[in-house]
Amino acid sequence: MARVKRGNVARKRRNKILKLAKGFRSGNSKLFRTANQRVMKALTNAYRDRRRRKRDFRRLWIARINAAARLHGVSYSRLIGALKKADIQINRKMLAQLAVLDSAGFKAIVDLALKA
């Protein structure tokens, strides 16, 4: 059986990792072993945080809606309950945008929800 020399394959694999590690500080971008560890950790963090980002934005929207709702004398939970009861289907992202950019429109939605 012929001997398999892995020079090209190994170099390609290492260069691929070093390319991913570009921009990391000191040996983390130059030494293969530490670069490999840093890249693995970075990819793990990226995977986790893509899921966490969705939670974080939802929390931000809820905080903004709650703050704006309390200016109009109603809590977040009461507002959401009233919106569901009034069958107003607007998501939290749009509601938060209204609260920040168009306070008059947000007030109109709050009043409409509380009437029902």
UniProtKB/Swiss-Prot annotation:
CDD domains, alphabetized: Ribosomal_L20 (cd07026)
CC terms in the record's Gene Ontology section: ribonucleoprotein complex; ribosome
Entry keywords, A to Z: Ribonucleoprotein, Ribosomal protein, RNA-binding, rRNA-binding
PROSITE patterns: RIBOSOMAL_L20
Protein's UniProt keywords contain rRNA-binding: yes
Domain of life: Bacteria
InterPro entries per the UniProt record, alphabetical: Ribosomal_bL20, RIBOSOMAL_L20_CS, Ribosomal_protein_bL20_C
One GO biological process term: translation
GO molecular function: rRNA binding; structural constituent of ribosome
Family named by the database record: Belongs to the bacterial ribosomal protein bL20 family.
Function comment: Binds directly to 23S ribosomal RNA and is necessary for the in vitro assembly process of the 50S ribosomal subunit. It is not involved in the protein synthesizing functions of that subunit.
Protein name: Large ribosomal subunit protein bL20
Gene behind this protein: rplT
